[in-house]
Swiss-Prot record:
Residues 1-24 are annotated as: Disordered. It holds the Pfam family Ribosomal_S15. GO terms for biological process: translation. Residues 11-20 have a biased composition (Basic and acidic residues). It comes from Thioalkalivibrio sulfidiphilus (strain HL-EbGR7). This is Small ribosomal subunit protein uS15. GO terms for molecular function: rRNA binding; structural constituent of ribosome. The gene is rpsO. HAMAP family: Ribosomal_uS15_B.
Length: 89
């Protein structure tokens, strides 16, 4: 249930801040959002998969923490990221 290498590379390419950036909050949030979207499709057909649901909740909470951190550090970067990902924050 993970993303393939091409998808990850595309996300990193789109949200990175400099050519060697792979760990900025923007990249991490974008990767987590892609994994969350992937899992939401899985739950449409596997409603009783509680083990994966726990992992989903951990990812959602990790994304929330990263977004809170980004909001406290740089409000403009936070707004740009939320609008580009289409999150409800």
């Amino acid at each position: 249930m993970s993303l393939n290498a091409e998808t990850k590379a595309g996300i990193v390419e789109k949200y990175r801040r400099d050519p060697s950036d792979t760990g900025s909050p923007e990249v991490q949030v974008a990767l987590l959002s892609a994994r969350i979207d992937h899992l939401m499709g899985h739950f449409a057909s596997h409603k009783k998969d509680h083990h994966s649901r726990r992992g989903l909740l951990k990812m959602v909470n990790q994304r929330r923490k990263l977004l809170d951190y980004l909001k406290s550090q740089d409000q403009q970067r936070y707004q740009d990221l939320v609008s580009s990902l289409g999150l409800r924050r």
